[in-house]
Amino acid sequence: KVLLPKDYLRLWLTGEAVAEMSDAAGTRWVDVAKRDWSDDLLAETGMSRAQMPRLVEGSEVSGQVRDELASRWGLPKGVVVAGGGGDNAASAVGVGVVKAGDAFVSLGTSGVLFAASDAYQPDAATAVHTFCHALPDTWHQMGVILAAADALNWFAGIADKPAAALTGALGPLQAPGRPLFLPYLGGERTPHNNANIRGSFLHLDHSTDTAALTRAVLEGVAPAVRDSYAAMPSTGTRINRLIAVGGGSKSDYWVQAIATSLDMPIELPADGDFGGAFGAARLGLMAATGAGVEIATTPQIARTIDPDTALTGAFAEAHERYRASYGALKGLI
């Protein structure tokens, strides 16, 4: 059988060859609308349904821990193993992004704008991923920025200062400066889908200092998020509520830069881990008890960071410069 990494672990735990919808959708062998393997797509790669694992929803039972392992670990017999989910789908369950209109922006190593949807509405031209969610009859749209906190950490290494120290010294949000950073350190996905593009600093002069370059990095990721946000409506997705998660969300400057670029408030959860592991635990609870999506609640919100309305025009102008600079940079490859 063809198994994804977590499904190989599942095979060892349960003896069952099973995959779940959200991860399997990324193989391109799944008919995402029908939530089933596609015989046509499998045939295009010389594969057949007989080679594929059984598909389940993330909240369904995929098997039980093998008796041998249960005995070794001191567990009762019959411990349920849920279908589970891919990293971002599980994070969405953890943070309560499970119904149309809800979304989160993750500022981790990569940047992700993830929006839940109650229908399959792809638009390949946008480079927005359209996959099955980890919950039944639910899909998601996802824009991906390959370098978010990764870009900040890269610059922090060059500056020889901790990333938190760099962002903590910035003070209140300012209009984007002339220095411009394109965060394509390893190519880019949404909306360009360009593996060859590479990053760049532009408009540097004698006055450019560490703080200006730090702001440029943060302000370079903000329009990248806006690109994903702007692509969503063509997939039929309208974002009504946005929550920020990930290490980068600890920087108020960065979150407000994104909020101002999107012209949309961003909510910050109270302290706690509401990521993929928490979402996986919720999926396990659903599988073990029959609980429904109602347990995937939104965490307590500590505060909301509003866009700076005095700066939305400046950030819109910076986004236009950012988009134009991509075209110029692409021509140099």
Q: Which residues fall in each region the model found?
A:
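Short linear loop/turn motifs
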Residues: P53-V61, G168-G171
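Short beta-strand to alpha-helix junction loop
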Residues: D31-K34, G58-S62
